[in-house]
Structures are given as C-alpha cells and as structure tokens.
Amino acid sequence: MNEYPKKRKRKTLHPSRYSDSSGISRIADGFNGIFSDHCYSVCSMRQPDLKYFDNKDDDSDTETSNDLPKFADGIKARNRNQNYLVPSPVLRILDHTAFSTEKSADIVICDEECDSPESVNQQTQEESPIEVHTAEDVPIAVEVHAISEDYDIETENNSSESLQDQTDEEPPAKLCKILDKSQALNVTAQQKWPLLRANSSGLYKCELCEFNSKYFSDLKQHMILKHKRTDSNVCRVCKESFSTNMLLIEHAKLHEEDPYICKYCDYKTVIFENLSQHIADTHFSDHLYWCEQCDVQFSSSSELYLHFQEHSCDEQYLCQFCEHETNDPEDLHSHVVNEHACKLIELSDKYNNGEHGQYSLLSKITFDKCKNFFVCQVCGFRSRLHTNVNRHVAIEHTKIFPHVCDDCGKGFSSMLEYCKHLNSHLSEGIYLCQYCEYSTGQIEDLKIHLDFKHSADLPHKCSDCLMRFGNERELISHLPVHETT
C-alpha cells in the first residue's frame, strides 16, 4: 500500500453532467432530507462501507437499520425529479453543516486529508473530474469539511524537536473540523475585522459608536465611512490625538478635574487661551494702550491718539536762560520760576523801569535776623529759604503770567485768578471741567475730556448730565434731581 496516497481530483467543467438519479450532487443540510441552497465546495464524496450495516451489533435497535433504506429511497426519488448541480470547487467553504447516518450533536473530527489552497488551484487548472461513487440501494452520505485555522497555529508553535521525533512516523494528515454556520461566519469576519463581533441578539455592533446591523457588510461599510479618519479624535486643550472616541472622552476628564483658574476672580475654564483672553478683557481693560515714547498708559485709543499729538507737535518752548525745552508752556514757566527766579526778577525790573533802582523786586526781599526768615517787602510773604521767596516774587509780582486764557488771551500769575476769569466766560459758551482746570468752547470736547481723564477715578456717570461719581450709591442718590425737574 502506498504510504502517501494520491489525493482525489476534482472536476469543474459542467458538473451538472455528474448529477443523476443514482448519485447525490447537492449538499444535505440536515438529517431530514432537506437540501440547502448555499454554494459549497465538496471536499470528498465517498460511498459508505456496506459492512457497517452487516457487522452491526445484535443489541442495536432494528428500527434504525430498517429506516436507512427508506431514507435512501427518499433521496433517490428527489434526484429523479430534479438535477442538482455540483458546486464549483473555486468557492471556498464559508459555513458547514455536518450530518451522519446517526443523529448526533457532537463535533465530528475526521482523519481524511483535505486539499490545501495550493493544491486546489492546481487541480482547478488541470480540470480533472470528480470521482463520484454511487450505489443503487445504499444511501450516500456527503461530508463537507472546513480546514480549521487551529491547525496552522498549532503547527507553527511546534518545536523543532517534536518535528524530528515525527520523521520516522507516518506524516499526519491535516485535521478537519466540521463547523456550524455561525462559527464559520465569525471566523471569516474576524480575519479582517477582529474587533467586530456579533452579539447575543445576532447583531453586529460598532464598538466606536451606537451603530448596529444584522449584516456584517453594513457594519464594514459603516466603519470605512465613519471611522476611517482618526484625526477627528483630537483633544482641543492639549491637541493630543486618540484612536477612538472613547479614549478621547476619558482623556477629556483629566482637563475637567484640573481647570485653569483666574487668580483675580473665580473664573474657571479648561482652555488656557480663554483664560488669557478673560484676564486681558476683564482685569486689564483700564490700561490697554501705552505710548512707546514715554511709556504712559491710557484706557482708550482716542486718548492715546491725543497723546501722540503732543509728541508730534512741532512747536517747542525754549528756556531763555538755559537749554531746557518743552512743548508745554506751563512746564516752561515752572522751570523758570524754580531754576531761574533771580534772573526772572531782574528781567522784570528791567522791563518796568529800564534800570536797577528802588523799584527793583530783588531789593524788596529782606532777611529778619530776629526770626530767621526771608521776607517779601511787597506783601509780607516769608520763608526760611531764600529760593522760596524768590519763587514767590517771580510768580506774584512779575509781569510774566503763566496762566493765559485761550479765548481772550489774558494772563494770570495765580491759578485762582485764572479760574475766576474762566467763569466769566460761561455766558459766552465756555465749558469748564468741574474736576480739573480744563476748559473748552465745545461741549463734545468736554465730554471726551471727562471720559478720558476722569473715567478711572469716577467710573459711574449720569446719563442726563455730565456729572460723574466714584461709586454707584452716589449716582443713585443723584438721579432724583432729574426727576423733580
């Protein structure tokens, strides 16, 4: 006997020629003679051994042996009425239903050799016929086999020592495991989509969302269309990407546990950019603009623009006694009085009398040795410092007036006289700021001045007039004035 028997060959050309009344050419799907409509590849078709029925034990049930010819007669009757095609061996086995002459729920393991995929391809090209054995009076059992995937895994895990021990023995044939339909479908589906499994209700559920379907093809299409891109699972806070949406949700909880908190108030957020914007808008809104030339801060762009005009002004006031220069006339006068008071008095005397003499203001400053004071002889002002008396004389008794009215051009040596003079222009349409020395002929200019200069100290303003208040309580107490009028 040949140690390596030759494998049976298959026939692919017109397999319907081999289906007749004496043989079965379609796969039975159970023990009741019902034939399945699925396409399967027949791995082997053999005639049962007739001795099995002759050598049966005497203790066996006689009714079983009597029913077997009836079962065979039913099969032959169906084959006479219809011709069934033998499926093509090109199609691989997707699901399998095993049956035998005895009803049993156990999984049957056969020791016959099954064709490998390479041999199937060779036999398909050779187009060799399928050997079909038939019998007139004996039922034919057809076994459909599926090569188990466990075989390849077991053979790969075998060590080299175990292979050497088996060289002297007969080479083992590939074990074929007969699987039911649901098991075979799951094995095939898990080869490409290992995460997608049918649940107990028979539905294929997506593990990334709530989608489910009873067809695996629908779930496969859903995975390609909906979950192909992983860029959508990106954290908006730290920009870290995740493979699934569930991992992203778990990661987002970390940011919720440790939010960004404002150190000036109770504001909280999980995004750092929002916290920065909140601090800039809420806590630093009073001084958002500053001058690059002198680093002076302003609360609005309009106020900064007015400040820029001071730097860009071409008119400069120069000190006639030194190299000091400024664009503010009041600043120049303050400089002259503080630094050059004596020279200012001499210049005033020359302007009035044309010469030094008894009218000289410098001669009006005396020193009281008893009380240790410098005294102004014109008005009696006294001070322990000579420079203070000189400044007093330069401001109060010279003809140079630092405060000049913009409307009429009249000058004043003191701020008090200057303010009194400005009040005289009220009937003529001069608007004065009641919080400082500012005055203007336009009401809109006064409103801009109040918003720019006094908004920080007096944030609460009345909508009916130009009054401003430091707190809301004073504003509320002021509002009844407008109701009575």
UniProtKB/Swiss-Prot annotation:
Gene Ontology biological process terms, A to Z: negative regulation by host of viral transcription; negative regulation of DNA-templated transcription; positive regulation by host of viral transcription; positive regulation of cell growth; positive regulation of transcription by RNA polymerase II; regulation of transcription by RNA polymerase II; symbiont entry into host cell
Region (Disordered): 1-20
Highest taxon in the source lineage: Eukaryota
Start-end of C2H2-type zinc fingers: 204-227, 233-255, 260-283, 289-311, 374-397, 403-425, 431-454, 460-482
GO molecular function, one term: transcription cis-regulatory region binding
Glycyl lysine isopeptide (Lys-Gly) (interchain with G-Cter in SUMO2) crosslink location in chain: 76, 177, 181, 226
SUPFAM superfamilies documented for this protein: beta-beta-alpha zinc fingers
UniProt entry tagged with the keyword NAD: no
Modified residues (Phosphoserine): 60, 88
Localization per record: Nucleus
Biased composition (Basic residues): 1-14
PROSITE patterns xref list: ZINC_FINGER_C2H2_1, ZINC_FINGER_C2H2_2
Keyword hit for Iron-sulfur: no
Family, per entry: Belongs to the krueppel C2H2-type zinc-finger protein family.
Role, per record: Binds DNA and may function as a transcriptional repressor.
Name recorded for this polypeptide: Zinc finger protein 639
